[in-house]
């Protein structure tokens, strides 16, 4: 029997919001702040919400308008308190207003008559990457890179099995040591989970740690093994709180009377075959997780390679785009794919395009086509979807851009406005330098185009992505210039933010 291993999962608390608070010399735990690009619209997603603002039941990935509305509701209640305490002021319009507001939780808790305010900080993705790198280097002071798996910009898994006897520490002590050093160096608090496998470490962090008191610095550390997992979490609801258990899976489980992990474990004793009928090979993962098992360790997840490779570009447009303007965006996105393939020396066999329509097409009335429900429960026209396959794998812009535009024309309804576009380069493989040719193929022209792409890529890498642009990128509605200044679809750097009352 293999020796029991010990894993840590560490998550930086409200990471983007915490970075913004620390850079403003504000306490991340008591400052009301959201990270969102208010220059777009109030429909924009909040990338992060500070812990003190989450306390007002504002979710971490709310739309900005949802945060604005919730703050209005809170302030309506607080204003009544201010009026009763004779601390509100009456304006010339005869209405009462707050005499003062604050974005600090301590001040707001001390004086219920204060108005709730908050800071809207524009995202600065490059800054977050820099801080994440700094924190990763802190972990490397204690463990080898071979024993760390960065799960995201703000979350890591660490196999600490061999380090506990070396440092003469328990897993809790080592986790606290690393978390404390991160806090000292960056001002950012973290939550940690300890488990006998990766799955249990993740659940200890995601679920159990949230229900235990934090220390004076806001740090929470929880532990799980297979037995404590069954005792603490077999009756936990909802199932969507569990790692890798999405809403679709939960709906199918509930049809069979399965509402908890305990239900699933008991069902699997006699109903294993039925689970495989419903979920296929994914049933194995569900059953293992129901019992608290996870066979994959650090070596397995680091060596994993997907069976097929693809490269994708996607964006949600800031407003509804008419069909002709949306086609311009598709051409720009295909060009970005071209440069990504060229840089990685890859070619693709086909392009898949998915176009999501705006809900205004339904709201205005008159639309009678197929519909679907978006993630917010709203009715929208059914998305357009299509694929174009090439005669031979390619990364040439003349093919990718023109064929993507033709595909867009073929699959979309020109009468509908567009809000979301995703384009995928499928089955990418190394570029061997070969062309599919016939008597009419001008191979010199193809080679010239490839060299031009490589030259343009070199200029972009040296002088910036906007150093070489097509004239179409200066047309109204084009987004290439803006997106070239972004990281992950969000601003790489921004202003200091605005105070909202």
Regions found by a protein language model. Give the residues of each.
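DNA-contacting surface of Y-family translesion DNA polymerases
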Residues: 2, 9, 241, 247-417
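Gly/Gly-Pro- and Ser/Thr-rich, intrinsically disordered tail segments characteristic of DNA damage-repair
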Residues: 1-288, 295-298, 443-501
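Short, hydrophobic beta-strand segments
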Residues: 156-162, 384-391, 435-441
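Short conserved micro-motifs at the rims of enzyme active sites and ligand-binding pockets
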Residues: 363-367, 433-437, 481
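A short glycine-rich, hydrophobically flanked beta-strand micro-motif that places a catalytic Asp/Glu
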Residues: 190-194, 349-353, 419-421
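Core structural elements
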Residues: 153-156, 347-362, 424-432
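C-terminal hydrophobic structural anchor segments
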Residues: 405-461
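Non-catalytic surface loops within mature trypsin-like serine protease
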Residues: 162, 196, 357, 392, ...
């Amino acid at each position: 029997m293999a020796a029991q291993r010990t894993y840590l999962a560490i998550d930086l608390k409200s990471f983007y919001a915490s970075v913004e608070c620390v850079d403003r010399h504000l306490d991340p735990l008591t400052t009301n702040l959201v990270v969102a690009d208010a220059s777009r619209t109030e429909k924009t997603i909040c990338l992060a919400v500070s812990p003190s603002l989450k306390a007002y039941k504002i979710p971490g990935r709310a739309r900005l308008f949802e945060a604005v509305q919730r703050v209005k509701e809170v302030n309506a209640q607080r204003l009544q308190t201010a009026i009763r305490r004779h601390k509100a002021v009456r304006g010339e319009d005869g209405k009462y207003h707050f005499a003062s507001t604050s974005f600090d939780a301590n001040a707001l808790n001390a004086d219920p008559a204060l108005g709730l305010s908050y800071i809207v900080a524009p995202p600065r993705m490059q800054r977050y990457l820099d801080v994440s790198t700094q924190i990763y280097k802190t972990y490397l002071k204690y463990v080898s890179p071979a024993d760390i798996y960065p799960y995201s910009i703000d979350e890591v898994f660490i196999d600490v099995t061999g380090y506990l006897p070396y440092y003469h520490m328990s897993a809790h002590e080592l986790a606290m040591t690393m978390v404390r050093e991160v806090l000292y160096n960056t001002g950012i608090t973290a939550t940690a989970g300890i488990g006998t496998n990766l799955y249990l470490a993740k659940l200890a962090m995601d679920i159990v740690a949230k229900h235990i008191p934090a220390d004076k610095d806001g740090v929470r550390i929880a532990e799980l093994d297979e037995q404590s997992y069954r005792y603490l979490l077999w009756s936990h609801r909802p199932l969507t709180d569990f790692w890798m258990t999405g809403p679709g899976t939960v709906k199918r489980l509930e049809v069979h009377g399965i509402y908890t992990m305990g239900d699933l474990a008991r069902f699997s004793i006699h109903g294993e075959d039925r689970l495989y009928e419903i979920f296929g090979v994914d049933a194995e993962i569900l059953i293992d997780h129901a019992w608290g098992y996870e066979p994959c360790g650090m070596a397995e997840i680091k060596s994993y390679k997907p069976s097929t490779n693809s490269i994708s570009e996607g964006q949600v447009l800031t407003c509804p785009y008419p069909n002709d303007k949306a086609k311009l965006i598709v051409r720009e996105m295909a060009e970005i794919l071209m440069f990504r393939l060229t840089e990685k020396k890859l070619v693709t066999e086909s392009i898949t395009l998915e176009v999501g329509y705006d809900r205004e097409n339904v709201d205005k009335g008159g639309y009678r086509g197929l519909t679907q429900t978006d993630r917010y429960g709203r009715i929208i026209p059914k998305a357009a979807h299509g694929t174009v396959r090439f005669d031979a794998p390619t990364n040439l812009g003349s093919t990718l851009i023109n064929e993507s535009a033709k595909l867009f024309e073929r699959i979309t309804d020109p009468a509908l406005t567009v809000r979301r576009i995703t384009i995928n380069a499928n089955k990418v493989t190394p570029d061997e330098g070969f062309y599919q040719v016939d008597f009419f193929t001008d191979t010199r022209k193809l080679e010239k185009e490839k060299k031009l792409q490589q030259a343009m890529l070199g200029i972009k890498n040296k002088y910036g992505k906007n150093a070489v642009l097509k004239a179409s990128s200066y047309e109204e509605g084009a987004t290439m210039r803006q997106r070239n200044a972004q990281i992950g679809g969000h601003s790489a750097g921004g202003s200091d933010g605005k105070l909202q009352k």
